[in-house]
Structure formats: structure tokens, C-alpha cells
Amino acid sequence: MITTLTCPRCRAETVWEGNPHRPFCSARCKTVDLAAWADEEYRIAGPEAPSDNDENDRE
């Protein structure tokens, strides 16, 4: 049985077995997704963390 998955970046169907880029369909989608994290396009839900400037303002 061949297991397929949907690439989280481009939504293309790809095969899981033997895919060195999984869960992505290609190295390009993997790199584009990494760049999106680096550019802070994705965020993890939760309260906003205080910035370094906030600590200096309290002194």
C-alpha cells in the first residue's frame, strides 16, 4: 500500500515512502517553509512575550 500525503506548503499530493523531503513534496517547498519561519510569517499562539525593551522601561 502506497501512503500519500498533502504537502503543507503547496498542497500537492506526494508519496511518503522514500521521500527525503517529507512532509514536503520537494526541497523547494521545504526551503520556502523554513524561510517563512525565519521571516516570522508563522506564530505560535499564546500570550505575547515581553521584549528586552520592556525590562529597561521598568527600571
UniProtKB/Swiss-Prot annotation:
InterPro entries: DNA_gyrase_inhibitor_YacG, Znf_NHR/GATA. Zn(2+) binds at C7, C10, C25, C29. Its cofactor is Zn(2+). One of its GO terms (biological process) is regulation of DNA-templated transcription. Transmembrane segments: none annotated. One of its GO terms (molecular function) is zinc ion binding. Keywords: Metal-binding, Zinc. Binds 1 zinc ion. Inhibits all the catalytic activities of DNA gyrase by preventing its interaction with DNA. Acts by binding directly to the C-terminal domain of GyrB, which probably disrupts DNA binding by the gyrase. PANTHER family: DNA GYRASE INHIBITOR YACG. HAMAP family: DNA_gyrase_inhibitor_YacG. Belongs to the DNA gyrase inhibitor YacG family. Interacts with GyrB. This is DNA gyrase inhibitor YacG. It comes from Geobacter sulfurreducens (strain ATCC 51573 / DSM 12127 / PCA).
